[in-house]
Amino acid sequence: MVRILGILSLALLAATLLGGCAKAPKMTNTGFLSTYDNLEKVSENRTKYMSGDFVAKYHKVIINRVQVLVHSEKPIMTAQERDDVINYFQAALERVMTNAGFEVVTEPGPDTARLRVAITDIQKSSFWGNLHPGSKLMGAGTGGASMEGEILDSVTGRQLGAVIQAKKGSQFDLEYFDGLDDVKDAINAWAKQASKTFESMRAKPESG
């Protein structure tokens, strides 16, 4: 018993020293966006741009398939995990846009926007950081993700909105271990933020 407690204590100490101040993945500039000139810094982990006329003039949206642009010497995910993350993000985007009042379509048009999103970095949760609940609460072993996304006029290609952001996962999900849980937590946080942005824009009175 003493030996087991000693091992757990060492694991917790290692978690504290190696990952106690877990940070979000780095934001990237991969060239995925059509332009980066419109972006303005919001925080250390977020830059964004949104055209004032987007909500008023566009009522439909084409949602391109989410891309994964993660470059690593060693594979970060299996093919199944990759598909799982893409499908999870795709479903989240469709919910956000539908709830915001946009009709999801497949053909370009004058009142139709195009949404493009890419995951540009992924940090899977590490098993050693989940050996003890205390280590997870301190951020050890916490994963996350970063992304780039933009909304374009589906006909002209004009950028209507864009964002680059990074997010680490939840430190409080202690029920079970899944290396992609924190990536999905990041996706959920981005979806929630996007929903708030659209709600705020629709709440503003139209000018003129």
Could you say what each language-model-derived stretch is?
Residues 1-9:
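Bacterial N-terminal signal peptides that target proteins for export
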Residues 17-20:
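C-terminal motif of bacterial Sec signal peptides marking the signal peptidase cleavage site
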Residues 22-87, 198-208:
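A structural "domain/chain start" motif
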Residues 73-84, 103-104, 173-181:
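Second-shell loop/turn segments in exported
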Residues 86, 90, 94, 101, ...:
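Extracytoplasmic/secreted envelope proteins and their assembly/folding machinery
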Residues 95, 99-158, 169-176:
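Surface-exposed short loop/turn segments
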Residues 167, 175-208:
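Compositionally biased, intrinsically disordered linkers/stalks adjacent to structured regions
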